[in-house]
């Protein structure tokens, strides 16, 4: 009689176990992206199931243990997983790499076969618009083929073995299912839909005892996402975390409590220390660079722009040194104006500010004239040079100052009858020829000095700008650069007598503009 009563309650208990219309499995989905993890959307990925990518026993943290440390997993010479570092984010939340999102996977009892629970989807996209796919928080994130194709999902649960149970999975990509911490479904790799079934009667389990069930799934590549489950296991949860996830790690609490904000200048902490509530604080946008200004835009987030080192001095070169900060280097041959800096390129034509317009510069030829008709003057490299061009004759007194080479005359008119001619003298005989003869008298003035440039055209009554010479290089100074007409002056060109096009190197110009 006792045996009959026990059998009755056992059968009743089994029937009660399988009378529910659905099984809800709390899951954690870790959103990923190819830009953050190269294991996702691998180019030319092999279409094949790759076994032994994870160890056969579940890890101590209740996630699969990667097989190969820092080494990658290859199939036919192509990456399938890059390393332990890239694998870590598949089933763990790593800031900026993976994003934990809670999810409920609901298996529905079959109408035709009571006690059989089914989930079927050939378009499994559970987090479209969530995680990194949230365009409000991540407006620049790429959407692949209209869906979020890159994520991993884990489910922790348990079951009581009654005998006769089985579990069938079909889908893509990676799937690992552990029964009692042992890997029994191994469908790793990037592949189209693949399937496998586990019959629990073959596992040597004890009837009436409970065992852990751990399910891991990844979608890593477009263009398919299939997930299909058929089972008569009565999966239940023995413990939930603070966020309502079965055997979870509290890593979805921030998502549950809506810590997301459109204010990109705020950050939120959500952990045990905040009792899993959102604690907001201002984001630190400092990039540690003294050559940048740090700021934050509510819609964009941190903005780090180059610092402005302009000191308002047009005659300094301003830049930022990563060690010393802003530096200001003086520009050679520069005269500062109110609105610009005037830089002299040709030393004999110094550029200065226009006295009538502080936003313009004018170039003028250096004045080397000494008002002496017997000297020829010329500017060479910014210095005036002088050449004696008159004869060294005695005037009315017949006396020549040999120290200066200048004739000393006390009268305005030279009388030829007063000239004393000494044939033994080295002083040449004066001549009334209109062309002066070169002097043989020694002098300290330089010889063989080039003649000054030919004079520009005589100005007309109204100022004008003369046309550029055809052989004037575009990089040379032009009349349009001087602004002569603004001061009531014309602008013409002085020919460079030393100009030889074939021998030119840098700063070589056939003509030089000047105001007159």
From Swiss-Prot:
It is found in: Secreted. Residues 1-19 form the signal peptide. Keywords: Glycoprotein, Secreted, Signal. Residues 418-427 have a biased composition (Low complexity). InterPro entries: Fibro_Slime (IPR011874), PA14/GLEYA (IPR037524), PA14_dom (IPR011658), Prespore-cell_inducing_factor (IPR051154), S_mold_repeat (IPR001673). GO terms for cellular component: extracellular region. Residues 418-465 are annotated as: Disordered. Transmembrane segments: none annotated. Residues 449-460 have a biased composition (Pro residues). Residues 109-249 form the PA14 domain. It comes from the Eukaryota. Glycans are attached at residues 134, 234, 250, 284, 333, 357, 367. SMART domains: PA14. Belongs to the prespore-cell-inducing factor family. This is Protein psiC. The lineage of its organism: Eukaryota, Amoebozoa, Evosea, Eumycetozoa, Dictyostelia.
């Amino acid at each position: 009689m006792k045996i009959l009563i026990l059998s009755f309650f056992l059968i009743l208990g089994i029937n009660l176990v399988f009378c529910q219309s659905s099984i809800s499995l709390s899951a954690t989905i870790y959103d990923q992206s190819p830009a953050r993890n190269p294991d996702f959307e691998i180019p030319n990925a092999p279409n094949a199931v790759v076994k032994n990518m994870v160890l056969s026993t579940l890890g101590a943290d209740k996630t699969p243990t990667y097989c190969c440390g820092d080494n990658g997993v290859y199939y036919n010479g192509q990456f399938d997983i890059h390393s332990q570092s890239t694998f870590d984010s598949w089933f763990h939340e790593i800031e900026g790499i993976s994003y934990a999102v809670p999810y409920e996977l609901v298996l529905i009892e079959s109408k035709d076969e009571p006690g059989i629970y089914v989930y079927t989807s050939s378009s499994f996209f559970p987090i479209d618009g969530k995680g990194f796919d949230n365009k409000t928080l991540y407006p620049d994130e790429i959407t692949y083929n209209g869906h979020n194709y890159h994520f991993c999902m884990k489910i922790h649960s348990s079951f009581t073995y009654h005998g006769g149970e089985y579990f069938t999975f079909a889908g893509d990509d990676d799937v690992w299912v552990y029964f009692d911490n042992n890997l029994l479904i191994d469908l790793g790799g990037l592949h189209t839909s693949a399937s496998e079934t586990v019959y629990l009667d073959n596992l040597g389990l004890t009837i009436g005892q409970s065992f852990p069930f751990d399910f891991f799934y990844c979608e890593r590549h477009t263009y398919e996402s299939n997930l299909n489950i058929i089972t008569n296991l009565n999966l239940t949860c023995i413990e939930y975390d603070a966020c309502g996830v079965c055997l979870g790690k509290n890593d979805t609490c921030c998502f549950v409590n809506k810590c997301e904000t459109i204010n990109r200048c705020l950050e939120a902490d959500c952990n045990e220390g905040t009792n899993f509530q959102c604690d907001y604080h201002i984001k630190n946008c400092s990039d540690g660079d003294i050559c940048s200004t740090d700021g934050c835009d509510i819609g964009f987030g941190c903005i780090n722009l180059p610092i402005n080192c302009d000191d308002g001095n047009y005659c300094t070169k301003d830049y930022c040194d990563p060690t010393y900060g802003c530096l200001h280097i003086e520009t050679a041959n520069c005269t500062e104006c109110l609105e610009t800096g005037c830089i002299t390129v040709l030393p004999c034509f110094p550029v200065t500010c226009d006295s009538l317009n502080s936003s313009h510069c004018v170039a003028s030829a250096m004045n080397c004239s000494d008002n002496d008709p017997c000297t020829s003057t010329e500017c060479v490299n910014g210095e005036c040079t002088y050449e004696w061009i008159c004869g060294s004759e005695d005037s009315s007194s017949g006396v020549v100052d040999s120290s200066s080479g200048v004739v000393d005359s006390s009268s305005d008119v030279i009388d030829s009858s007063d000239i004393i001619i000494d044939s033994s003298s080295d002083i040449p005989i004066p001549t009334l020829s209109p062309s002066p003869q070169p002097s043989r008298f020694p002098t300290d003035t330089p010889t063989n000095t080039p003649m000054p440039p030919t004079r520009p055209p005589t100005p007309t009554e109204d100022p004008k700008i003369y046309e550029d010479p055809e052989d004037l290089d575009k990089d040379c100074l032009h009349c349009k650069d001087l602004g002569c007409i603004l001061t009531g002056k014309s602008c013409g060109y002085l020919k460079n007598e030393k100009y030889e096009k074939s021998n030119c190197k840098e700063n070589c110009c056939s003509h030089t503009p000047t105001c007159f």
